[in-house]
Amino acid sequence: PDVLNFMQRQLNLRHKYYVMHAPNGALLGGFCTNANKEIAIVGRASKKIGIDSFMFNKDEMILPINRRIKTLIPYRSKILSSINGHSVINSTFSLNSQREICLAKTCGKGGYSSSTKNSRNRELKKFLNSGGDVVDQALLTPNQLADIYLELFERRWGVKPDNKQQMVDMITSLRDMIFGYVLFYNGQPCAFQFITRADSPKWICFDYVNGGYDREQDGFCPGTIVTWLNVRAAYELCEREGKEMRYSFGKPTAPYKDRWCERAPLGRTLAV
C-alpha cells in the first residue's frame, strides 16, 4: 500500500482497490488495478507513463491473498508468484514459457555450503583489514545514496542513469523499505546494491533491483562481498523475526545468479 500510494502521487495514477472479506469481517485478500485496465504498477500502461524511472523490481507479483481461499483474477499477468498458485483458479505455471525468478539460498541448513560461507567471510575480512569499511545504508541521506548508486553504476556499466530525483523521492518517501550496505575503500564508495524490503506476516521480501561497484577494486571482489553481506543480513533478520526469507535476484539473466540462488516458477493468469 505504501508503494501504491507513492506511485499515485508521483505519476497521478488512478488506482482502484478490490478487497475480499470473510462473513465475520476478516480480511481475506485484495489487489489493485490501474484505471480498471490492468494490475497496478506491473502493467504496460504504468510502464508507458514512466514507472521504470523508479527503482522497483517487477519480476514477481505476490498478491495478498489468503492461501486457504480460491478466487479469480480477471486481469492478465505472466509474473504470478508460486505463493498464489493454489489460490488463483485461472492461473497456470506449466503454460508460461518456463518463466522463473532467482531466490537467494538460505544461509542456514540446506543453503550455502560451509566452504562457500567460509570463503565469503575470508574475502570480507581481507577487505576490512586492507582499509575497507561497511556502512549501513540507513546512515546515509537519500541524496548521498542516490549519488553513490549513480556513480558506481556508471563505473560498472559505463552509463549513468538520469533518474536521480526519482531515486531521492523514492528513498525519502519509503525510507524503511530500503535495505543493505554500502562498501567504502579508503573513504570512497566502491560497491552498493539498491535493495527494497517489504514485510509480510509470514515472510520478508527483499528485491535486489540493481547495483554498481568500482572496477578498480576488483582485487577485493567488492560485488561478491556486498552481495554476501546483504544476503546474510537479510537471513539474520528473518531468523530473528521468525519469518521466511524471499530474497529475489530477479529473472535468471546472468550465470552468477545460479551460484547465489535457486529458481522458482512464475505463473500466468488466463483470460476469463
Stretches found by the model and what they are:
Residues 72-95, 248-268:
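Conserved active-site alpha-helix within GNAT-family acetyltransferase domains
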Residues 27, 34-55:
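ATP/Mg2+-dependent ligation/transfer catalytic cores
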Residues 177-272:
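Aromatic (often tryptophan-rich) hydrophobic motifs at membrane interfaces
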Residues 54-66, 82, 116-120, 164-165, ...:
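Well-ordered, non-membrane alpha-helical segments in soluble/globular domains
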Residues 1-39, 84, 88-96, 110-218:
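A conserved beta-strand-loop-helix scaffold within acyl/acetyltransferase catalytic domains
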Residues 97-105:
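Conserved alpha/beta-domain cores
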Residues 61-78, 234-250:
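Conserved GNAT acetyl-CoA-binding A-motif
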Residues 45-61, 209-221:
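A short, internal acetyl-CoA/4′-phosphopantetheine-binding micro-motif in the GNAT/acyltransferase core
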